[in-house]
């Protein structure tokens, strides 16, 4: 393996060029930067940067790992990698849909046409014929497991953000993808943020070239402050933690775009409230755990996993291109979102551990380094600034710990052992993750599955893990999910939907024990039954943050009802899904959209629909209502309102509540009544809206918009894209693209009749 260390002393200017300074075989070298034409690329800039130049000069084929700071031009390196591996299809994979679509736009200019697999249902209907494909990790691993043609023709594979392998939830998928690349001999380029022990990662992927880059396109200046000392600069006397955070920022007096990383999400919301109430800032967020005051000052926002996805995307765009200059965030923003800033401010808590005799920090040291990676905007900032504000430890203790962190060994979540976690869809979360991890290779290689699994980094580091996997295979064989050495057709179906056999067992248990509940309370009964098929954690703390005691009380009532009716102990956060599915967020004026993971259930509902159609345990009328209730958060009897464009969660639930008030049996009856302008229904809708809107003017506007949307509705109801996707199960992809919504519904009703038995 050739190892290159790109040094900080490298220089780069977009117009003037610069130089690459690096160490190779213990010798320091200095070279001029390459021009795009020299490497066969037609690009709108004059020079490749030092990292790109060094990669092109030293990469001669095979696998490679690049470990470098954020925003150092790794995307272009993907194309340079392709130029030396032109045989076969070029595949780029990353963890998030936003990154996938960002790369789609970048690569389109080079390849002309680019295939996409981001989890969207319509994409699955399109056959991939393009030379290049961008895909999320999950879409790519599904293609690999099923031997999809576009994966089998891979000639070059780029795994971006490969450091996500350290994550408990998704790390196993990256290990699986790398094992397939190694097994099939697919040239692999792994792109990583700066991580400790990256050399171990390079050895694992059998890299011919490893570049460890210390160079940043925009130089970083780090400053560490003690919070107590910093607050002496301000005239006010802040008392609460959130007041201290905002006062510290005022003391720093930063200009330009600033990301403020906080160790706790509640502190983020509280700081936002202080900014709004006492500093006159205008809050960009719409879904909030407090009542916002209308202000006209500078914009401010908070970004974390609790914020609805649609709002997160708006906030990101406003920070990139708009007038939003101060954005509070938690550590989720440090990974997977391309959002550079002029400055980052990182609030860190430290404590001295008497057992290890060393300081512990939160957020952890690697996350702090990732957060620093957001500092500096190429072409806009001459320098990026990292301001670390610490409590509970001395400044030099943190500085020393950050240096030592980069010298530690590389670890993954699997190699260290998985933790049990409340809220998992199955009783045994660890078995569930491990079963899916091994069933992928079993699906692809049959009896040779061990050979691929032995290539997993975690198995190499922890050989006892292989023994655990062997025991799980034996158990799955006893349970009937593996016959001989082959997974059954049911097992293949489950794995293609990312559902473990253990989750399926839990589903069957609920199916048998909720018959009466599904008849009496269909929203509660069906959502509880299918909950094991949904991968999301559905954190109750997120819901409680926005709804306070109301959810705590309602959640307890839901759990008691479920346990009484089914005899099953509820510990998978089913109450969150049911609270959402009943439309309960409508009662909270501070909530514009369902928060957190509840705003990202579209892909989950599509996979759920595919699985339920293939299982054929319910007729399609039931399946359709269940998946739309999951997708849109509208009660079972009115859930098809979720397919009406322009309604969304709040308007859909306003209609559903009006329908319930007048005794409408379903959404079709309700829609017809609105179209016919039946006074009883229209008055009921106004009554429902009056609960949410105190302004008569706003109420009338919302009422008129809902009525206008409903009057344009055409029957039959249903999301055409989703229905075509589901119908493709029975008529094939090409035919599904040709048929209309009516025909798709006809196909589904003919084939999904609930005739199978378990």
Where are the regions a protein language model picked out?
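A short beta-strand element within the Helicase C-terminal
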Residues: 326, 332-350, 384-389
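Helicase-associated low-complexity/disordered flanking segments
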Residues: 1-54, 61-64, 269, 280-297, ...
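Conserved interdomain linker/interface between the two RecA-like ATPase lobes of SF2 helicase motors
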Residues: 179, 195-275, 301, 305
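C-terminal helical accessory/scaffold domains
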Residues: 461, 470-653
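Conserved C-terminal RecA-like helicase domain
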Residues: 69, 91-120, 254, 259-326, ...
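Conserved segment of the helicase C-terminal RecA-like domain
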Residues: 343, 358-403
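Conserved helix/coil segment N-terminal to the catalytic DExD/H
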Residues: 121-155
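SF2 helicase catalytic motif II
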Residues: 138-139, 147-188
